[in-house]
């Protein structure tokens, strides 16, 4: 016992010495560690929590964009058994040449995703001094992959043109941010909508964490009720529908243990609790031969395990870098896609960034320190991402995990950027953190973001209805932007009566003044005649 106390004291003294040294150094002064009442180890812990909850985007984004075929085309299809040259249908089958191209593109996109996240996060930390991580956002990637380019290039716009659209939209958004219009637009959003955004985004994240493809698998699709309780031992790999063994999924119960570890740690104020749950579940899932392993004894599992055992691997981007073309910009579909992306960015990402600032306690009188630089970085990162071959890069709502761990300065964002840099070399490890390890943390993020619901004035019908619609639509429409738009729309509609009444009173006052002046003039004229 005495030895343990000595070790604990030594560790505590060493940590204090490290924190004091960093705080007094150039790094500490640059990031204002003492002014914001934080330490290096706190920022490191916050960055680790943020990165671990964001890391899933590396593989998810790569897989979604690869579904579009990316830079692969019919020219990559190989001729099978000396038959005639392959036709357009070769991209939909299992053509060896095309599949090899898809495999290469996925590796390109993994590196591109990490690189764009690194650049965005570093810029946010160094230029805005805010603890927010950036990465290619969910939503825009699916829109580009499945609606614009189409599955394996089946849409009307090529991947090269799609990246040109992202580039142009990023430049336009950067201009709006540079002119200071983005911050003003954010402050025009009613306070009740801003507060509801925090709650709605939390529910959105928690909903993602509960799903099969990105979380613990507690909920899944149902033909009658849309969603239902699942956690099934057998599920459809495509739809996620339950095929049998409801509530008997081993990975779900392992995720529950991870969630309880995180919850207990937070309940006892244990620093790093968000990390411990993820690390525990991941470590168990890396053991082969168990029911919860991420490496089953299948051809795919063996392939993933062989890649995992490499530990260190760096892939040089071969095809997506600079894959930009403006040749199709005469098509009307191009401008529809541009308008859609710009609209989502203007309302969605602005709301997310402002909400993160509110959750972190940075907002005072509707503004926050580093706001202008933050908006520029958030917009400019999309320009960088498009050049690398990925979609819109934006502030991630998972940054709230780092805020919960005490992140208060840009040092958190810088460390997140360095983690993404490291992930480019440790892709075999990072890409094999299972979804059921990340899911519990996403649910916990939803729990902590629910706290601001108490600040909404539920006794005021206009604010209550606005907040409820905003919160409800974010998870149910699977869109943060939809919730914001609906909330603002409801608020404006309910405010119209007061506006019309105010205008009517003003016009009535003007009429009375005119009549009074007219009567005075008439009286004077009468006196003069007499």
Curated annotation (Swiss-Prot):
Q: Which family does it belong to?
A: Belongs to the nucleobase:cation symporter-2 (NCS2) (TC 2.A.40) family. Azg-like subfamily.
Q: Which Pfam families match?
A: Xan_ur_permease
Q: Name one GO biological process term.
A: adenine nucleotide transport
Q: Does the keyword Cell inner membrane apply?
A: no
Q: Which organism is it from?
A: Arabidopsis thaliana (Mouse-ear cress)
InterPro entries in the cross-refs: Azg-like, NCS2
Mutant lacking the gene: phenotype: Resistance to 8-azaadenine and 8-azaguanine, and, to a lower extent, to 5-fluorouracil, but not to other toxic nucleobase analogs. Deficiency in the uptake of adenine and guanine.
Q: Where in the cell is it found?
A: Membrane
**Which named protein is this?**
Adenine/guanine permease AZG2
């Amino acid at each position: 016992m005495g030895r343990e106390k000595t070790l604990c004291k030594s560790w505590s003294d060493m940590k204090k010495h490290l924190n004091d040294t960093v705080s007094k150094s150039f790094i500490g002064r640059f990031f204002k560690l003492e002014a914001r009442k934080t330490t290096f180890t706190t920022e490191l812990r916050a960055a680790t929590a943020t990165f671990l909850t964001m890391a899933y985007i590396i593989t998810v984004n790569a897989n979604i964009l690869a579904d579009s075929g990316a830079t692969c085309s019919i020219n990559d299809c190989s001729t099978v058994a000396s038959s005639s040259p392959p036709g357009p249908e070769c991209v939909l089958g299992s053509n060896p040449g095309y599949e090899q191209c898809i495999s290469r593109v996925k590796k390109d996109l993994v590196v591109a995703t990490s690189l764009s996240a690194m650049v965005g996060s570093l810029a946010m930390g160094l230029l805005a001094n805010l603890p927010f991580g950036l990465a290619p956002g969910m939503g825009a990637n699916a829109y580009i992959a499945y609606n614009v380019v189409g599955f394996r290039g089946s849409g009307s716009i090529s991947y090269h043109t799609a990246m040109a659209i992202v580039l142009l939209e990023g430049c336009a958004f950067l201009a709006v941010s540079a002119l200071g219009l983005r911050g003003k637009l954010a402050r025009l959003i009613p306070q009740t909508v801003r507060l509801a955004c925090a709650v709605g985004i939390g529910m959105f994240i928690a909903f993602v964490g509960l799903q099969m493809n990105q979380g613990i698998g507690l909920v899944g699709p149902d033909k009658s009720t849309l969603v239902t309780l699942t956690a099934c031992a057998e599920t459809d790999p495509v739809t996620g529908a339950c095929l049998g063994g409801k509530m008997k999924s081993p990975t779900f119960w392992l995720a529950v243990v991870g969630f309880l570890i995180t919850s207990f740690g937070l309940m006892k104020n244990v620093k790093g609790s968000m990390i411990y749950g993820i690390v525990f579940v991941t470590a168990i899932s890396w053991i082969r031969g168990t029911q919860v392993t991420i490496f089953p004894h299948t051809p795919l599992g063996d392939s993933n395990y062989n890649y995992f055992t490499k530990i260190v691997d760096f892939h040089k981007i071969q095809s997506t870098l600079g894959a930009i073309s403006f040749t199709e910009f005469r098509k009307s579909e191009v401008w529809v896609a541009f308008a859609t992306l710009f609209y989502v960015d203007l309302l969605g990402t602005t709301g997310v960034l402002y909400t993160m600032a509110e959750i972190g306690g940075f907002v005072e009188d509707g503004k926050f320190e580093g706001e202008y630089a933050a908006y520029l970085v958030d917009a400019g990162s999309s320009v960088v991402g498009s050049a690398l071959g990925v979609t819109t890069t934006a502030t991630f709502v998972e940054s709230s995990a780092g805020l919960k761990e005490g992140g208060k300065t840009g040092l958190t964002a810088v460390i997140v950027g360095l983690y993404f840099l490291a992930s480019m070399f440790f892709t075999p490890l990072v890409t094999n953190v299972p979804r059921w390890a990340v899911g519990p943390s996403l649910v916990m993020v939803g729990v902590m973001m629910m706290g601001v619901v108490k600040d909404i004035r539920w006794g005021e019908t206009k604010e209550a209805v606005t907040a409820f619609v905003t919160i409800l639509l974010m998870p149910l429409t699977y869109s943060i932007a939809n919730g914001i738009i609906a909330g603002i729309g409801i608020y404006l509609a309910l405010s119209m009566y007061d506006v019309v009444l105010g205008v009517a009173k003003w016009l009535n006052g003007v009429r009375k003044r005119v009549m009074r002046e007219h009567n005075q003039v008439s009286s004077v004229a009468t006196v003069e005649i007499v």
